[in-house]
Structures are given as structure tokens and as C-alpha cells.
């Protein structure tokens, strides 16, 4: 079967939800038995989002093979079974870097390097490479049509549609159809102008996804179809919903998957959305609720912790609970004290970088440990828990991380200078290494200690989880901390790096160096998050007695 391409663009304004729409369509097509993958093309000049501020760009999603990617890839993995790789996300910066590298190497035989054909050819080559082995590949272009940054991507996709044949390509355009209260009606003009912008660069959309706060009336859909030269059945109304997991059913109810399959002449069974119906049922019928306090430094933008937020919701589905997330700035713990932590049923300290707010996180870990509140530490959250235990239990009063104090006397957390990647290759890092692309990244094996809470939760001895860090537990000082009672319950494949720690004589205190949120899905959840939310609910029931 030839590979079929769906190109997804956005118009009028940004943040319409192209990624969610693309992932939802992929979920329906997958439910019809098709092998689907999704790619994200980002117009910014950064090589990847690895060094971008989380408060500007949101979280960095890490793939199995260690690529630092856009948060939309997290949505893709939560909606479909296909795992993303470094082939599923690339930026303008990465494209230009590769073209310039080839030019220096002499690959272009002295040609004058230009956007067309060299940049566009590189884009096309990467899209085709990422599509190998799949029935359908959905390609999302970041940004908004009309932005100068996205023009090379749009031109490349226009050319690709000609090369592979229009019978194997479909352009899907998301637009805003705003409702004007004073007029009492939705307005289609922004959509018409957005399509006109696409037409000016040679792209005629085949499907229009119309975003609004309500369903688009049939007469307005007919109007959009007429003036935008699109089949009326291909004008899809995508209203605001309470849960993003309602969107696959909403798109299917309007026949989008049927239209796509007919366009590509694919013969496949009807989509079975039973799993998604179960997700929605659990979401709509919780038997209780819990409040989780998330203590971090990027709390002004919840998207900075997107996968953690979703993983907590998934754990709620697993336990039939509604999970409320209370975002707490770790600096508030420093300035206002632990009073800001009162009233939460469980405490989660996610990953992060830099010294700002660290002492507040350490006080948070101490509060959770001493008051028997369920605690889940992730990446930095584990290092924080270790520092707190070293200072207040093990007698290492000057314990710290060399990330925060290079000259600290008791660096219980220090820079990893050498480690093995998932393929067994040795990676080396020094203080002079670049910040970008030099961390321990991607899926790594972890061995769980028999009898530990982690082993009980996972139900197996060896697991594989994704990492993104450059600091680790210092094994030189670890024996003194273990002697004071801290349990190391997870170790790397070579048994050299600490992956999981647990505090004994506590209802639930588990911290991990890896990022379990990256592998949590609404259909399957994740054992660590499920166990944490369950423990938080037990704590909640005690507090309301």
C-alpha cells in the first residue's frame, strides 16, 4: 500500500488545537486498523526545544530514542499506539543546520544554496523518511498560515503533494469561526480569508476544521463550503468540549474518517472507539476526588508540565477519581512557609533546572516526609528528596547539588560525566559541554529491587523509562544516606546510577530520576502515578473523617 499524507495547517489565530485535532483523527484511523504516525514541523530557528524556556514554549517531550521535541508529540502518543521518534519532529533550525553541514562537506557540488530547492528538498526528504512503513502519516505544520517563518514548509508540502500525487495527499486546514454575541451569529469571513491566504501559495484545502465555542449551523457550513471551494461534508464543526478525549468521537460523528478513507480509496472496517468510550465513562463518573499540590518553578504556565498534568488525570481514570491540581510556586514556600501546602492530599515535585525555588522544594519534601503526605518526586523532585533526607536525617547538613553550588562540601547530587545510552554507547560530558543535546536522554533500563513499593507497582523486575537530566546521585556519599534509612529501589542497567528512592515508614514516598509522565496514556495510565493518586485518596479519606 502506498503511503498517504494528511497535511494539517492552521489559520486566523494560533493555539486552535491543530495537534489535538491531528491526534484525534489519527486515533480514529488507527481504530479502523490503519498504521498511522504523526509528524510536527516547527518553524522556529532553534535546533530543538531543549534549551527553550518552559514558560515560553511549554514542556519538552522526550521520545523513546532520546529526541527533545515539541509537547504536541506527547499528545500524539497519548492518542495513538505508535511511538514517536526523532523523525517525528524537526525545526527550521534543524533543517538549516543539516543543509549547511552538507554544503560545508561539498554535497551540493558548488551550487548556490537557496531556500528553493535545497531547504524545501531537505524538508521533503525528512517527511518521506518519517513516513516509511506507515499507511497514513499526518503532518502538522506549526504556526499560522501567513507567518513568514512557515513558508518554506508550506512550499515543501505543496511540492510533495505534486510528487506523490494528489490521490495520496489531503490538506486539512483548521480555522476559527468566532461567535459574535452582539450579532447573535458565527462569522465565516476569517475562514474565507485564511483559505485565500493558503490559495495564494498554491494550496487548496480539502477539509476545513472549524473551531468555535459551538456547533456551526448547517447554513453556515454550506456557506463556508461554497466560498472556500470545499465539499460541504468536508466542513467539520469542532466545538469546545470539556475533555480533549471527546474529540475523536466528535470528528467521527461528522464522518471525517469516512471522507479520508474514501479520498485515499482505503477499504477498512468501521472505527471501534470502545476504549475511548470507556475513558469518557470513567471521566464522567468518578467515585471521589483528590487534590494534588504540584510544587514547581514554572507554575504560571501549566503547559510547562503538560505530560505531568495529563498523567495525573490518567491516574484519576485508573482509580475512578477526579484529580484537582493545585499549582504552587516553590518560591512561595520559601517566602510564605509550608502553610501554602496545607489542604492537599498528595504532593508532586516535577522536573526542573536551576537554583531558583530549590530551597522551597526542599522544604516541601521535608513537609511531605514529616507529615506522612504521599509524595512523588520526578527527576529534580528525586534529587530534592535526596538532599532533604541527607540534610535532615543522615546528618549531612551541608548536602546540596553541584548544579546549585559548584563548591558545596557535600555534593550528594553531581554532574554525570559518563553514562551509557539506550544502544550501549558511552556518552561523556564535562562542565564545558554545550547545554543543548548533552543530557542523558531517552529510554533506559531500570532494575527494581525485590520487595520495594516500585517493584510491587510495576509488577516486574526490569522496566524501561525515559530520562532527561545531566545530574545524578553521587554514589560516594550514598552509603551514609542509606545507613540513615533511605532505600534505593531502582538502579540503571549497569547498577551505577540511582533511578528510584523510597522513604521507609511512610504511607507513600517514592521519587524517580526518570520521567514516567512521558509514557502515561488515558487508556493505560502509569503504575507510579496510579499508585500515587491512590495513596493521595487514602490520605484524603483520613482527613475528612
UniProtKB/Swiss-Prot annotation:
Known activity regulation?
Allosterically activated by GTP, when glutamine is the substrate; GTP has no effect on the reaction when ammonia is the substrate. The allosteric effector GTP functions by stabilizing the protein conformation that binds the tetrahedral intermediate(s) formed during glutamine hydrolysis. Inhibited by the product CTP, via allosteric rather than competitive inhibition.
UniProt xrefs under Gene3D superfamilies? 3.40.50.880, P-loop containing nucleotide triphosphate hydrolases
Q: Kind of enzyme, top EC level?
A: ligase
Q: In which pathway does it act?
A: Pyrimidine metabolism; CTP biosynthesis via de novo pathway; CTP from UDP: step 2/2
* The entry's keywords: ATP-binding, Glutamine amidotransferase, Ligase, Magnesium, Metal-binding, Nucleotide-binding, Pyrimidine biosynthesis
Q: Which reaction does it catalyse?
A: UTP + L-glutamine + ATP + H2O = CTP + L-glutamate + ADP + phosphate + 2 H(+); L-glutamine + H2O = L-glutamate + NH4(+); UTP + NH4(+) + ATP = CTP + ADP + phosphate + 2 H(+)
State the SUPFAM superfamilies in the record.
Class I glutamine amidotransferase-like (SSF52317), P-loop containing nucleoside triphosphate hydrolases (SSF52540)
* CDD domains reported for this sequence: CTPS_N, GATase1_CTP_Synthase
For region Amidoligase domain, the annotated ranges are 1-266
ATP-binding found in the keyword field: yes
What family does the entry list? Belongs to the CTP synthase family.
Under the subunit heading, UniProt states:
Homotetramer.
Instruction: Report the protein name in the record.
Output: CTP synthase
Species the sequence originates in: Haemophilus influenzae (strain PittGG)
Amino acid at each position: 500500500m502506498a503511503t498517504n499524507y494528511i497535511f494539517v495547517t492552521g489559520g486566523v489565530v494560533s493555539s486552535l488545537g491543530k495537534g489535538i485535532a491531528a491526534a484525534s483523527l489519527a486515533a480514529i484511523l488507527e481504530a479502523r486498523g490503519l498504521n498511522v504516525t504523526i509528524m510536527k514541523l516547527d518553524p522556529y530557528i532553534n535546533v530543538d526545544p531543549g534549551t527553550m524556556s518552559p514558560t515560553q514554549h511549554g514542556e519538552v517531550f522526550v521520545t523513546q530514542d532520546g529526541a527533545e521535541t515539541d509537547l504536541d508529540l506527547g499528545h500524539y502518543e497519548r492518542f495513538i499506539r505508535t511511538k514517536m521518534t526523532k523523525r517525528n519532529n524537526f525545526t527550521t533550525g534543524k533543517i538549516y543546520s543539516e543543509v549547511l553541514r552538507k554544503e560545508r562537506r561539498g554535497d551540493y557540488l558548488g551550487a548556490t544554496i537557496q531556500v528553493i530547492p535545497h531547504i524545501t528538498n531537505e524538508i521533503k526528504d525528512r517527511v518521506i523518511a518519517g513516513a516509511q512503513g506507515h499507511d497514513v502519516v499526518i503532518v502538522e505544520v506549526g504556526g499560522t498560515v501567513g507567518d513568514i517563518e512557515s513558508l518554506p514548509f508550506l512550499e515543501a508540502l505543496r511540492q510533495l503533494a505534486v510528487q506523490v500525487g494528489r490521490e495520496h495527499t489531503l490538506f486539512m486546514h483548521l480555522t476559527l469561526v468566532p461567535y459574535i454575541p452582539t450579532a447573535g451569529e458565527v462569522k465565516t469571513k476569517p475562514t474565507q480569508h485564511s483559505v485565500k491566504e493558503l490559495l495564494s501559495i498554491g494550496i487548496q484545502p480539502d477539509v476545513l476544521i472549524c473551531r468555535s465555542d459551538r456547533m456551526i449551523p448547517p447554513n453556515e457550513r454550506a456557506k463556508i463550503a461554497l466560498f472556500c471551494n470545499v465539499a460541504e461534508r468536508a466542513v467539520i464543526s469542532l466545538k469546545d468540549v470539556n475533555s480533549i478525549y471527546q474529540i475523536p468521537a466528535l470528528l467521527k460523528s461528522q464522518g471525517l474518517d469516512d471522507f479520508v478513507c474514501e479520498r485515499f480509496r482505503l477499504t477498512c472496517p468501521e472505527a471501534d472507539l470502545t476504549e475511548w468510550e470507556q475513558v469518557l465513562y470513567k471521566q464522567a463518573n468518578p467515585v471521589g476526588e483528590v487534590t494534588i499540590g504540584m510544587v514547581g518553578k514554572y507554575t504560571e504556565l501549566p503547559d510547562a508540565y503538560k505530560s505531568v498534568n495529563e498523567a495525573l488525570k490518567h491516574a484519576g481514570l485508573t482509580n475512578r477519581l477526579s484529580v484537582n491540581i493545585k499549582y504552587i510556586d516553590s518560591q512561595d514556600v520559601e517566602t510564605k512557609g509550608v502553610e501554602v501546602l496545607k489542604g492537599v492530599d498528595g504532593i508532586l515535585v516535577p522536573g526542573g533546572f536551576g537554583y531558583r525555588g530549590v530551597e522551597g522544594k526542599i522544604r516541601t519534601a521535608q513537609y511531605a516526609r514529616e507529615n506522612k503526605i504521599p509524595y512523588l518526586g520526578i527527576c529534580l523532585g528525586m534529587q530534592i528528596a535526596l538532599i532533604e533526607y541527607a540534610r535532615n536525617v543522615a546528618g549531612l547538613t551541608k548536602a546540596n547539588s553541584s548544579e546549585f553550588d559548584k563548591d558545596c562540601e557535600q555534593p550528594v547530587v553531581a554532574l554525570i560525566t559518563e553514562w551509557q545510552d539506550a544502544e550501549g554507547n558511552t556518552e561523556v560530558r564535562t562542565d564545558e559541554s554545550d547545554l543543548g543535546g548533552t543530557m542523558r536522554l531517552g529510554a533506559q533500563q531500570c532494575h527494581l529491587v525485590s520487595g520495594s513499593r516500585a517493584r510491587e507497582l510495576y509488577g516486574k523486575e526490569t522496566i524501561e523509562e525515559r530520562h532527561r537530566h545531566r545530574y545524578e546521585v553521587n554514589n560516594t556519599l550514598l552509603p551514609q544516606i542509606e545507613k540513615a534509612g533511605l532505600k534505593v529501589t531502582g538502579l540503571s542497567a549497569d547498577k551505577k546510577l540511582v533511578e528510584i528512592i523510597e522513604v521507609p515508614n511512610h504511607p507513600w514516598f517514592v521519587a524517580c530520576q526518570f520521567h514516567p509522565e512521558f509514557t502515561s496514556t488515558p487508556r493505560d495510565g502509569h503504575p507510579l502515578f496510579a499508585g500515587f493518586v491512590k495513596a493521595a485518596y487514602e490520605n484524603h479519606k483520613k482527613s475528612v473523617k
